[in-house]
Every structure is written in C-alpha cells, then in structure tokens.
C-alpha cells in the first residue's frame, strides 16, 4: 500500500508529456485487454490530463479510459436508468442531450459543458441525473474522468452514436 501511494505520488507530479510517453510505451509492451486498440502517442497525451490524478500505477490507467478506445460499449436498459429516474425520464434526457450536442458547432469542452449545464438548470433537471445519464450512455461507467473533456475527446459523431445506441437500448 505504501509503495502504491508513493508510486501514485510520483505519477501525479510527473510532467504530462513524460507520463504520456511512459504510458504509451507501457501499453505498447503490455497491451491492456480493456482496450480494443492502443491509443496513439498524441491520443495518450490528450488523455493523460484526465487520469493523472487518479492512477497509482501505469496499469491503473486503462480501466479509466477504456470507453474511449472501445469499438462498442455494452449495457442493459436497466443499467442506463439512473437512481431516481424512470424509463421515460431517461429517454427524454438522452434525446435532449442528442439535440443539444448536435447543435454545438465548435465541439470542445467548454461549449459542451455550458450547453448541458444550462439546459439542466433552465429545465429544473437535477444535474446529477442529467449528467449521470449522459455519462453512463457514452461510457458504460458510473464514474469516469472529466465528462465534458471525455465527450470532446470521443468526438461529436461517436458521442451522438453512443447516445443513439443508448436510446435504442431503452426502446427495445
């Protein structure tokens, strides 16, 4: 435990580019089974900022970002429905998210965050319900690295595809 803490402390203080290089080399030498493909060095540099404060070892990184490098994510309709919501609430939230994200021309973190937060606030939707539903639909995880940056990295097309996939799952 002490060694994990020390290693985590070292990784958190490491230069982002150096950590990205270490991760890229580690994944190249020991491909994680969680990833359908190994991220490029440029992709690795982009995701390091999402996970640097969460990992204790290089091996810890892949589970946090697996959703970014999976061809398909799998879940059931029951898993998509957040606590405190029902089927219709979840469908409405995901449909609204599709509409909001589809209308963002400059698809980057700040615009994504502003659009989703503003909509939830103006429509008196609990932010946790709204963002939790979106998070699970695109990551198949209850917790993930920074949601808005993750959406930016996934890209508009893949994000919208995953939201549509979640809506189809709820409709079946």
Predicted regions mapped to residue ranges:
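Preference for short coil/turn "hinge" residues that link or interrupt alpha-helices
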Residues: 4-7, 100, 118, 147
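Charged substrate- and nucleic-acid-binding regions of tRNA-handling and nucleotidyl-transfer enzymes
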Residues: 110-170
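Small-residue-rich helix-loop
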Residues: 16-123
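Non-catalytic terminal extensions that flank enzyme cores
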Residues: 1-28, 32, 150-157, 161-172
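Core structural elements
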Residues: 1-9, 53-56, 125, 136-141
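Non-catalytic, well-ordered alpha-helical scaffold segments
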Residues: 1-4, 17, 45, 49, ...
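Short helix-capping/linker segments at secondary-structure and domain boundaries
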Residues: 12-16, 59, 140-146
